[in-house]
Amino acid sequence: MSVIFVIFIIIINILIILLSSIFIRNYLRGKKFKNQKYLSKETIILITGGCLGLGRELIHLLISLYNCKIINLDIRESEFHSMEELYNKNLKNIYCNIAKIKDIIKFLEENDVNINEIDLVINNAAIANNLPLEQLSLNNMISTIEINLLAPMKIIKSFIDYYNKNKNNQKQIHFVTLCSVMSHIISANSSDYITSKWGLFAFMESLRNEYLYNNKYIFTTICPFATNTGMFPNFIFCMDKKWVSKQILQSIVLKEQIKFIPDFINFPIYLYKFLPSCLSNLVQYYIINPFSKNLGRRIENDNLLK
């Protein structure tokens, strides 16, 4: 009994230290954020999938707080008019199926976008099926990988190649990629989505290390927990998208390398990885897997195969 009590006390102390450190870190982070002058009305931002969810919330914050100029690549033309009316000259919407574009630089130039003026690239567009493997078609799986993984890779690769060819252009460019906590917490019924996000996280981490001492390129990877954007409509614990978008904005302004949202999700992720397989299997079966039985945003319903 005394051993169990000691273990309990140790766990409580660890949790207190963890929560205290998160509170202090967020307090200092908030003060630093208020003093930063990174974004302004001169900042030009390229974002993918900005018509819905976190993308739309980010566009709202970037324009309302900093008066930034936004170029939004999306396929949802029905949203274009209302957004342009709301944000006037600060927003330019361009119809684009990012999964099918081979040369993003050429595409942007054809749409009268000056590549040299872009300061920030936000890879936000993503889809989720959330179906067991047996119910997934190959077309579904390929589309998920194309949109969630290959499209951000092609965009970043194209921009870096373009800037490397233009040696006279010494401006700094910041790549922000919205990944997911599910790149670290593996659940059932999401094999294609998790594969794409795991690969995307690895890609961003590899690039960050590749350009570690190159100040020309900045890489920020955002890993949020499930958010009420409609991608996981039946998920029980969804974070508020307005709050999440503010956390993402802080990470962008502070040029953070990796940001998990919420912060404390780090602790259970790494604790889970240290569990012996017999215990991790129990956690997986009774805690993680039941939460994955929800309907995601269907590719067919979103016309993402056009």
What are the residue ranges of the model-derived segments?
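Active-site loop-to-helix junction immediately N-terminal to the catalytic Tyr of the SDR YXXXK motif
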Residues: I186-I194, S206, F235
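C-terminal helical subdomain
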Residues: T221, I236-Y270
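Residue(s) in the substrate-gating loop at a strand-loop-helix junction
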Residues: S180
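Substrate-binding pocket helix/loop in short-chain dehydrogenase/reductase
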Residues: P132-L133, S137-I142
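Conserved NAD(P)H cofactor-binding loop of Rossmann-fold oxidoreductase domains
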Residues: N124-N130
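Active-site helix of classical SDR
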Residues: I156, S196
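Canonical Rossmann dinucleotide-binding motif of NAD(H)/NADP(H)-dependent dehydrogenases/reductases
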Residues: R29-K69
